[in-house]
Amino acid sequence: MKTIVILFVLALVFCTLEMGMVEAGFGCPFNQGKCHRHCRSIRRRGGYCDGFLKQRCVCYRK
């Protein structure tokens, strides 16, 4: 039982550290407007945050 608890705690700590190191792109996930403006700046119609936990900026096709 102790082994399972220790493994669970280590997995939780590892996941927490990994989540903190993720670099979100172009304002995602907290500033979808920044993603939209980025997409407009590269001559797309706009964009939105998508993917796991909305970490990726996706631009609309023309």
From Swiss-Prot:
Low expression in both venom and non-venom glands (hemolymph). Belongs to the invertebrate defensin family. Type 2 subfamily. It comes from Olivierus martensii. GO terms for biological process: defense response to bacterium; innate immune response. One of its GO terms (cellular component) is extracellular region. Keywords: Antibiotic, Antimicrobial, Calcium-activated potassium channel impairing toxin, Defensin, Disulfide bond, Immunity, Innate immunity, Ion channel impairing toxin, Potassium channel impairing toxin, Secreted, Signal, Toxin, Voltage-gated potassium channel impairing toxin. Disulfide bonds join C28-C49, C35-C57, C39-C59. Coiled coil: none annotated. Gene3D superfamilies: Knottin, scorpion toxin-like. Antibacterial peptide active against Gram-positive bacteria (including S.aureus ATCC25923 (MIC=2.5 uM), M.luteus AB93113 (MIC=2.5 uM), and the antibiotic-resistant S.epidermidis PRSE P1389 (MIC=1.25 uM)), but not against Gram-negative bacteria (including E.coli and P.aeruginosa). Also blocks the currents of Kv1.1/KCNA1 (57% inhibition), Kv1.2/KCNA2 (27.5% inhibition), Kv1.3/KCNA3 (IC(50)=23.4 nM, 84.3% inhibition), KCa3.1/KCNN4/IK (15% inhibition), KCa2.3/KCNN3/SK3 (87.5% inhibition) and Kv11.1/KCNH2/ERG1 (30.4% inhibition) channels (tested at 1 uM). It is found in: Secreted. GO terms for molecular function: potassium channel regulator activity; toxin activity. This is Defensin BmKDfsin3. PROSITE patterns: INVERT_DEFENSINS. It holds the Pfam family Defensin_2. InterPro entries: Defensin_invertebrate/fungal, Scorpion_toxin-like_sf. Residues 1-24 form the signal peptide.
